[in-house]
């Protein structure tokens, strides 16, 4: 919501310490990433499906994201995640609620996977190299199939 975004902006500028600032930057990065994802999603929905989101989140929220530029939101999210990695990577990001600690790792450990996903695992990006053995025992590399449509099916029995 705009109110939450305003609060995060205040926390980032308030000089309340690296922990508060870093957590606020990370929260804003996650917010922008979510907004970019929803902005893309909302532009593809039928009016009936869109109405479900309007009922859940409010028509103003849906309209704001429909009008938003998802590319700009994604670029801002990437910048914010990178800032967390560059400036707050070592800050403890564990969450303490009612005297119990929920281990979440450092802020850098929380931001790095999102940054990796945005830079390497998004639509239009070249997939990372995969080397494995197929079901027939033959070694293969994903790059052997470059230029071809490939479906990867990961499964296992744990």
Which residue stretches match the model-derived regions?
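Amphipathic alpha-helical repeat scaffolds of TPR domains
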Residues: 1, 21-41, 48-60, 109-110
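Alpha-helical adaptor scaffolds
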Residues: 1-13, 18
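Alpha-solenoid helical repeat scaffolds
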Residues: 6, 22-26, 95-98
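Alpha-solenoid repeat scaffolds
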Residues: 17-18, 34-39, 87, 91
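Active-site acidic short loop of glycosyltransferases
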Residues: 18, 146-148
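N-proximal helix/coil linker or "cap" segments that precede and/or mark the start of modular domains
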Residues: 60-146
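Conserved redox-active cysteine motifs that mediate thiol-disulfide chemistry
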Residues: 146, 154-158
């Amino acid at each position: 919501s705009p109110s939450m975004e305003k609060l995060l902006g205040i926390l980032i500028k308030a000089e309340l310490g690296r922990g508060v600032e870093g957590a606020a930057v990370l929260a804003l990065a996650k917010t922008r990433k979510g907004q970019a994802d929803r902005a893309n999603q909302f532009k593809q929905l039928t009016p009936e499906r869109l109405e479900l989101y309007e009922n859940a989140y409010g028509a103003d929220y849906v309209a704001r994201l429909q009008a938003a530029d998802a590319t700009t939101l994604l670029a801002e999210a990437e910048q914010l995640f990178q800032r967390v990695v560059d400036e707050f990577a070592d800050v403890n990001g564990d969450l303490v609620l009612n005297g119990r600690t929920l281990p979440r790792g450092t802020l850098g450990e929380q931001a790095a996977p999102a940054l990796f996903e945005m830079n390497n695992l998004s639509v239009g990006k070249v997939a990372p190299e995969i080397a494995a053995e197929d079901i027939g025992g033959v070694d293969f590399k994903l790059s052997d199939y470059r230029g071809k449509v490939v479906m990867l099916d990961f499964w296992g029995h744990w």
